[in-house]
A protein has these predicted regions:
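Small-residue-biased structural context
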Residues: 1-258
Length: 258
């Protein structure tokens, strides 16, 4: 028998996906408000050198301790499941570019040697962050809610788990044979995002996962290993791993210089 707590109208306040969207939006709003208030000391006020340096150090510390870890957790929990799907692949790529711009601005902020440089870096952090979070709220999260195989409620819970400092489960084996074909890839990409460099898992499938390999090539070029352990006819087992930065760099150089 279905519990009345499980009955809801899609898109209403009782819809768990809608509730997850609201929670994620509030999280983003809180982060942006905190970053903006700290940056305003540098961008809106003309402070004495000692006060400016203190404000600069406080904003840089916030970025290192809260902002960048938040962006990293968001990438793992929300971006990775959408990284291979055709409707969201380019969107994720664009958001990751914005993350890179923010990270670069944080470095510029931390090393700024003048008020003008600190002001420019602080402004870049906030404006890029605002654009990134707006796209995430308005485009990516609604797309995740509709993406087959991606459960937005669980993804939001994964984000909260990482932000609390806990680690997400990393299964050694992912058997997708009982999962509908259209729902497999987001789950696999989400599991890959949890891997540290050098770690891997074994994918078990009932067909040769060549389409998945093409999605990995598009989303993570030269960043993963793909080794067949068993190749049919009824079962395929593939070890998928995240390469270390050194190995990935060597592979990239080898690809460019055959």
């Amino acid at each position: 028998m279905t519990s009345t707590s499980d009955v809801y109208i899609e898109g209403t306040q009782d819809d768990p996906h809608r509730q997850a969207q609201i929670r994620l939006s509030k999280r983003n709003d809180q982060l942006l408000a905190k970053a903006s208030s700290k940056a305003a000391l540098l961008t809106e006020l003309r402070l004495e050198p000692r006060d400016r340096q203190a404000a600069q150090a406080e904003l840089a510390g916030f970025c290192a301790d809260e902002l960048l870890p938040y962006l990293d957790a968001t990438d793992q929990a929300l971006y990775a499941p959408a990284a291979g799907a055709a409707p969201t692949r380019l969107l994720v790529r664009a958001l990751r570019i914005q993350h890179g711009i923010i990270a670069g601005s944080v470095v510029a902020l931390d090393t700024a040697s003048s008020a003008d440089k600190a002001r420019a870096a602080a402004r870049s952090v906030v404006t890029t962050l605002a654009a990134c979070l707006e796209i995430q709220n308005a485009v990516l999260v609604p797309a995740l809610a509709e993406l087959p195989g991606a459960d937005l409620t669980l993804l939001a819970e994964d984000l909260e788990t990482m932000l609390s400092g806990a680690q997400l489960e990393k299964p050694d084996e992912i058997d997708v044979r009982r999962i509908p074909h259209g729902e497999r890839h987001p789950r696999i990409f989400g599991s890959y995002a949890r891997l540290a460099p050098g770690e891997s898992f074994v994918l078990v499938n009932n067909h040769d996962p060549k389409p998945l390999r093409r999605e990995f090539d598009a989303a993570f070029p030269d960043q993963f290993e793909w080794n067949y352990l068993e190749a049919g006819p009824k079962r395929w087992r593939v070890r998928i791993g995240r390469l270390s930065a050194h190995t990935a760099r060597c592979r990239t150089i080898g690809t460019r210089n055959p």
